[in-house]
Amino acid sequence: MGPDLDFRPLKSFLTQHALSYQSANVAVTYVAALPAIQGERPRVIGYISLTCSEVDLGGMYALEDCQHANRYPSMPALKIARLACHSDYRGRRVGEALVDLAIALAADHIGPTVGCRFLVTDSKARSVSFYERAGFTLLETEENQARAEPVMFLDLNKLDLDPANDPALPAQTADGTPD
């Protein structure tokens, strides 16, 4: 989105393919948009497309809380298939908010309903640090490190999803009212 050549395929996906992928139950796309001004359409400033997936951790990551599952070659995951932010809004936490949405969907809805241990993505090389800041880990296999778009994963069971522990939220009393 915006003039960056690396992101042109991401922009064309949103305008040309996202709806058909969603209609065919291949991927669901969520957009971040600014409200419409003076009768114009809302302005899309970012989007994320999610799909069901699995991740082969190559024996490099063991589940400590479910050792028996370690015998399986892959684990259930939700995949960030596409993530894009308009160039005018990079650095303004739009991408972070969209990744947070994916985490919330995986942890609060998908995981408890059908089982989903990981959030995964095939990261563009220049986006690896973005995903690392979001808590993702680069899969440490030689094959993965040689890929143009290496696999990164986030173990949803390792997250502290208790809102009471979020320093960005105001403290609350036991009855839920602000402190």
List where the protein language model places each region.
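Non-catalytic substrate-recognition and accessory regions of acyl/acetyltransferase enzymes
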Residues: 1-92, 96-124, 128-179
